[in-house]
From Swiss-Prot:
Pfam families: potato_inhibit. The lineage of its organism: Eukaryota, Viridiplantae, Streptophyta, Embryophyta, Tracheophyta. SUPFAM superfamilies: CI-2 family of serine protease inhibitors. The record marks 34-35 as: Reactive bond for subtilisin. This is Subtilisin-chymotrypsin inhibitor CI-1A.
Length: 83
């Protein structure tokens, strides 16, 4: 019988907004309703190596997973005008 038989390995429980045992933040519900610029600022404060992409809410997005990419989806609130 090996010394590992019958042993139970315990791993840290994942925290909210993390993947696996990582403590890296993966979502920012607190920025909902903020301007894209303010949301990007907060995301970069939490995850400085993030590539933050500001895109329209109905835009097509990349299907490949990139752990450093964060999408900030925005909607135009008023009609853009010249002047």
């Amino acid at each position: 019988m090996s010394s590992m038989e019958g042993s139970v390995l315990k791993y840290p429980e994942p925290t909210e907004g993390s993947i696996g045992a990582s403590s890296a933040k993966t979502s920012w519900p607190e920025v909902v309703g903020m301007s894209a610029e303010k949301a990007k600022e907060i995301i970069l404060r939490d995850k400085p190596n993030a590539q933050v992409e500001v895109i329209p809410v109905d835009a097509m997005v990349h299907l490949n997973f990139d752990p450093n990419r964060v999408f900030v989806l925005v909607a135009v609130a008023r009609t853009p005008t010249v002047g």
